[in-house]
């Protein structure tokens, strides 16, 4: 689940500039503004909202809520045609960030104190694998579906592909005990 979710959510770093240029004809300045808005929202969610969310809902529900926000954002971004709406939706999309710290908390609790370094090493390794797989996969999907001569022109396809991965994670997490799932 951790690897699938990380691959799915790494789409933003992998294709955001390419996608927003293709879909909305954004300038580098507009891309920078959108990334700044996301960064601020990301910091607020991680710095202010994660702890109360986990306290109120627990780790599993927080993960599920984060997955739901992430899935909804990706599907919406796939079909958007107005860049102004995308900017407005960034704060809601950033709520998907709730899942990652809750997943890491579950990972940490799944092993004893003497294995904390090992589990964090595994998580870091999976993150690194995702950062190799995602750019190759998502830029290829974007290239195929952004070719104006292709049968199907749909630059939002990488977001639908990522949404499918998040949906799979949601299905797995909602049906199993967390320690054996991650």
List where the protein language model places each region.
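Helix-to-loop junctions at the C-terminal end of transmembrane segments
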Residues: 45-59, 142
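Short amphipathic helix-loop junctions that connect adjacent transmembrane helices
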Residues: 14-31
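Helix-loop junctions at membrane interfaces in 12-TM secondary transporters
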Residues: 76-90, 99
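Multi-pass alpha-helical transporter architecture, strongest
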Residues: 160-182
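Intracellular juxtamembrane helix-capping segments at the cytosolic ends
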Residues: 98-112
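Loop-to-transmembrane helix entry/capping segments in MFS-fold secondary transporters
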Residues: 28-29, 111-125, 152-155
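Structural signature of the two symmetry-related core transmembrane helices
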Residues: 61-76
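A membrane-interface helix-boundary motif in multi-pass transporters
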Residues: 140-166
